[in-house]
Amino acid sequence: MEHTVQDNPERQRYELVVDGHIVSIADYHERDDAIVVPHVETDPAHRGQGMADRLMAGVLADLRASNRKIVPLCPFADTYIQERPEEQDLLA
């Protein structure tokens, strides 16, 4: 199963694409040098398969590469980061 995480700035969201289909999204809006993530969602047919984890890993990798931070308002996104001390430096 091939997957990629892509930023879609026109729709203000990150997308996890698996085999050509968007299966998970993280909505965001820009704030200074950070993104605010109020919502993460996975297609019901793909829940329970770690898709949102893959999405968040890609989002954080992109933020790290672009020297930006995150404000995780979504409980899932917040828990994902809190459970990974190595990612907490990305918190705004």
Language model features: what each stretch is:
Residues 8-10, 31:
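Structural motif
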Residues 1-6:
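Conserved N-terminal entry element of GNAT/NAT acetyltransferase domains
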Residues 13-23:
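Conserved beta-hairpin
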Residues 48-61:
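Conserved acetyl-CoA-binding loop-helix of GNAT-fold acetyltransferases
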Residues 21-29, 36:
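Conserved beta-strand in the GNAT
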Residues 88-91:
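Short, hinge-like loop/turn segments at secondary-structure boundaries
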Residues 40-47:
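A short, internal acetyl-CoA/4′-phosphopantetheine-binding micro-motif in the GNAT/acyltransferase core
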Residues 62-75:
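Conserved GNAT acetyl-CoA-binding A-motif
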